[in-house]
Swiss-Prot record:
GO terms for biological process: DNA transposition. Keywords: Nodulation, Plasmid, Repressor, Transcription, Transcription regulation. The keyword Repressor applies. It comes from Rhizobium meliloti (strain 1021) (Ensifer meliloti). Residues 7-23 have a biased composition (Low complexity). Belongs to the SyrB family. It comes from the Bacteria. Residues 52-65 have a biased composition (Basic and acidic residues). This is Probable transcriptional regulator syrB3.
Length: 151
């Protein structure tokens, strides 16, 4: 029979398994080429300088766009011919609309005050005319009584 107490050949098998099961780190391939360092990006075209338009120029461009649209051009073409972007057009249009509302609101209290003053004046004139009418009716009544001999 074989002697089982001899563990000589079994030990290397366990050691071999231990080496196989040992965690191995991620191996890097040295054959992959290195990336070139990034070059500084150069702008293709210089950015367009932002241009500020005065209120008068804005309103003129908005009127120009409105006339072109009324002539039959598309809104997009009219905006392009005015030399502004669609976003700018809508921004200016909204600002013009809100400015018009503010103007109306500012003039309302003035016109309301004028209307109130006119109303007061009309009421005074109405009172004066009523007094004149009452006086005229009294004088006519007294004359009629004298003619009829009722006094």
């Amino acid at each position: 029979m074989v002697d089982e107490s001899n563990a000589g050949p079994v030990a290397p098998a366990v050691v071999a398994d231990a080496e196989v099961k040992a965690p191995t780190g991620k191996k890097r391939s040295s054959s992959r080429p290195q990336k070139a360092p990034p070059e500084p990006a150069q702008p293709k075209m210089p950015a367009a300088k932002r241009r500020g338009y005065s209120e008068q120029e804005r309103s003129e461009k908005l009127r120009l766009i409105e006339t072109k649209v009324s002539e039959g051009n598309t809104l997009k073409d009219a905006i392009k011919s005015a030399g502004i972007s669609e976003q700018t057009y809508y921004h200016w249009k909204g600002a013009a609309k809100s400015a018009a509302r503010e103007d109306i609101e500012r003039t309302r209290p003035l016109s309301a005050g004028d209307e109130f003053a006119e109303l007061v004046q009309l009421e005074e004139e109405n009172q004066r005319l009523r007094k004149q009418l009452a006086e005229k009716l009294r004088t006519e009544n007294t004359e009629l009584r004298k003619r009829l001999g009722l006094d």
